[in-house]
Amino acid sequence: MALDLAEYDRLARLGVAQFWDGRSSALENDEERSQGGERSGVLGGRNMDGFLAMIEGIVRKNGLPDAEVCIKGRPNLTLPGYYRPTKLWDVLVFDGKKLVAAVELKSHVGPSFGNNFNNRAEEAIGTAHDLATAIREGILGDQLPPFTGWLILVEDCEKSKRAVRDSSPHFPVFPDFKGASYLTRYEVLCRKLILKGFTPRPQSLLRPALRVLGATIASFRKPRVCAHLRHGWPAMYPVGQSRIRVNF
């Protein structure tokens, strides 16, 4: 059975459009309440919901039409961790009692990129390491490894594309970070989050990352396939004034 990417291109563009529409509405409401600034646009909670249809479409089209796709309700989106008791995810996919996929959806819009990038990086690294360790320690029981993903939408603007210098007087910064813009830093972050044994493609796209999700779904559809899917392709998908980077 060939993988079906479920119109990912169109759905990704709709997701970006919905993000900016939702953010603009939040800012307008904020101004009406005279609370000022960027806060509502940043904290508008469900601005990334437009990408849920893309993820759910991949699940439904690749062998698990009756899978439970959890997107709401704190108890439904909570998984145990190894270094902390629990972690709240944005999307969880189950086939019966088996965890098929866990995905985080994030965004980063200016004007501040410096500290916020570090916060996003620390969050992504911690989340990936925590869940991977819990899985190795057997928290999910006897099942195939689930698909795990971290998708971030970054504003494509002058500040995010500007070269940034770092000062590290005691030891040198890794070459791939020297003079790198924040957009490039996100790409480097995603590449380095890839599980050992995979080499990033020279031109990373959203499509190959979603193919990994589809392949994982298909592996659950065929229980006799016991290959350990150690996967992770980063993806960058330029759409209008945004760029989507995905690490799976």
From Swiss-Prot:
It holds the Pfam family XhoI. It catalyses: Endonucleolytic cleavage of DNA to give specific double-stranded fragments with terminal 5'-phosphates. One of its GO terms (biological process) is DNA restriction-modification system. InterPro entries: Restrct_endonuc_II_XhoI. Its EC number is 3.1.21.4. Keywords: Endonuclease, Hydrolase, Nuclease, Restriction system. Disulfide bonds: none annotated. Signal peptide: none annotated. One of its GO terms (molecular function) is DNA binding. Belongs to the XhoI type II restriction endonuclease family. This is Type II restriction enzyme XhoI. It comes from Xanthomonas vasicola. The lineage of its organism: Bacteria, Pseudomonadati, Pseudomonadota, Gammaproteobacteria, Lysobacterales.
